[in-house]
Amino acid sequence: MVSITLPDGGVRTFPRGTTGGQIASAIAKSLGKAALAVKIDGKQRDLALPVEQDCRLEILTRESPEALELIRHDAAHIMAEAVQALYPGTQVTIGPAIATGFYYDFARSEPFTPDDLVKIEAKMHEIVNADAPFTREVWKRDDAIEHFRSIGEKYKAQIIEDLPATETITIYRQGRWYDLCRGPHLPSTGKVGHAFKLMKVAGAYWRGDARNEMLQRIYGTAWRTEKELADHLHQIEEAEKRDHRKLGREMDLFHVQEEAVGSVFWHPKGWALYRTLENYIRTKLDAAGYVEVRTPQLYDSSLFKASGHWDMYGDNMFKIRESVAEDGTEKFLGVKPMNCPAHVQIFRQGLKSYRDLPLRMAEFGNCHRNEPSGALHGILRVRNFTQDDAHIFCTEDQVGQEAKEYFALQLGVYKDLGFDKIAVKLALRPDVRLGTDETWDKAEESLRVALRANDLEFEELPGEGAFYGPKVEFHLTDAIGRSWQCGTLQLDFQLPERLDASYIGQDGARHRPVMLHRAILGSLERFIGMMIEHYAGKFPLWLAPVQVVVATIVSEADAYAQTVAETLRRAGLRVEADVRNEKINLKVREHSLAKVPVMLVVGAREAEQGTVAVRRLGGKDQEVLALGDAVARLKDEARSPAGAETVSPAF
């Protein structure tokens, strides 16, 4: 007999070899029908596999968080079967579940077309309706390689050849079709349901290597219910309308081009937005006791070798060969991918005492990372970016209070910027790590206490911390429900040791400071791209690149319009005067497309009376105000949440 511990703590005994599916049915017939898979001691397994030893067991159903990954994994297999049924000779490679769906890479001489996707999707529905069971088989390694080569599936043969010799080779069948797969799978194709859709075809190199063959990747999405699918498709449609690249052009904020791949050309209006955000963060940091620094871009490789980045992060760095010695030894420089080693260099200048701690060092640091060209995306994923980076050097006893204060600062910033749905995750010690268990216990508990002190609910992620310390991640939900990982706080016990940072403690001896890596926005470029999509370009007045446009109805009001614009400018507002000889409806339409929050419409009457007609973006009504009243109201509305002293950059 085996003892099964259930999620509620109850213990049941079953004959050794009882399957997960049989256990589910024994608990309740309805559970047996709803079961999709099981988790045994935290690992997912097929329902049909026997349970051979005592364990903790959880029955996974369609409502389980893990269900979507299982559904999407099976949908990828069903799509591959459909493709090979419709287009014989197509070779299959890999097909995983991903964040919102699945994909499968195919080797085929003819390109897939939109019409092909319609046919493949229809065939997938047929396969689901057939409700063929998924069955698991274990094959001998050599037999599997020989078999796949014999049927022309060279990619599958390569995958098996590259697996460790100890790896069990498993094949899953669904009807007459089969594929190499570790599993687990649902009981049958019918359990996938019909809430799926094929989305697009893209190119992909075999194993992600540009030196290999180009394959065709078909992307799909799959969900538990038709409603979830419809909601997701609506979100995609809404995201296309909000695409920061499209709005960036319409609002004249920035552009990117091939001659500077992965870098942003900020236009005057976009740079005004950038500087407004930067100045806001700077004001918040000043109030929180940070000192701002500026560090170089280019360093001798010795610094990055000492910090560990040359070995651990070297492939993502831009390197410059500076010289070659007579013996052939090459000397390299590295463009910094992050700011932390440089901040340690500043900390090391001069003797530091425990009285100097905590030291909060901030920088709007310009960094470069050698991202693959295929991964670049507008300003959301670039090679050259600026981080609102800071490092807090403190004692171990100060970690909890510093984390608490940082979380409060971070949450305040997100609220000011319009984000109130925040998921917090605490990544805990990995198996391979530096430091003692006692140090990790203290660090992890300090972060827990700090999170609770800010009334933050958080999810713990065992094993997902960095090898040098635990990490807190902040995930923001935007206006259409997408999640973005932004801020982080990471404890680092390693870098101060590697780069020989120390302070004199109360005992007169040298000690290593704890280093807290933290960023609120992360990359400013990425955060601005995210905000453009979150607000659909309709920024609150204080952030808007152009806050006010003064538009004339008749040419007789041109001089007055310029006077109004100058008055607003002196009040600190970002303003344009539109005195073109065009109809007012055209001006309204164009400035609405540019997402200008406020238009002040002036004609002969307004010029004579010293008034303006205030028109809000998206509104149909106008409010006539005296110029002085309008300026006072708009100045107050445009006040930065960081305080009245924040400068409003002109463009």
UniProtKB/Swiss-Prot annotation:
A single Gene Ontology CC term: cytoplasm
Binding note for cofactor: Binds 1 zinc ion per subunit.
Family statement: Belongs to the class-II aminoacyl-tRNA synthetase family.
Molecular function per GO: ATP binding; metal ion binding; threonine-tRNA ligase activity; tRNA binding
Cofactor (UniProt): Zn(2+)
Family matches, as Pfam families: HGTP_anticodon, TGS, tRNA-synt_2b, tRNA_SAD
Enzyme class: ligase
Protein localization: Cytoplasm
Major site of localization recorded for this protein: cytoplasm
Keywords, ordered alphabetically: Aminoacyl-tRNA synthetase, ATP-binding, Cytoplasm, Ligase, Metal-binding, Nucleotide-binding, Protein biosynthesis, RNA-binding, tRNA-binding, Zinc
Superkingdom classification of source: Bacteria
Annotated residues for binding of Zn(2+): 340, 391, 517
A biological-process GO annotation: threonyl-tRNA aminoacylation
Entry function: Catalyzes the attachment of threonine to tRNA(Thr) in a two-step reaction: L-threonine is first activated by ATP to form Thr-AMP and then transferred to the acceptor end of tRNA(Thr). Also edits incorrectly charged L-seryl-tRNA(Thr).
Presence of keyword Aminoacyl-tRNA synthetase: yes
Descriptive protein name: Threonine--tRNA ligase
TGS domain span: 1-61
EC nos: 6.1.1.3
Subunit composition and interactions: Homodimer.
Chain intervals for the UniProt region annotation (Catalytic): 243-540
Substrates-to-products reaction catalysed: tRNA(Thr) + L-threonine + ATP = L-threonyl-tRNA(Thr) + AMP + diphosphate + H(+)
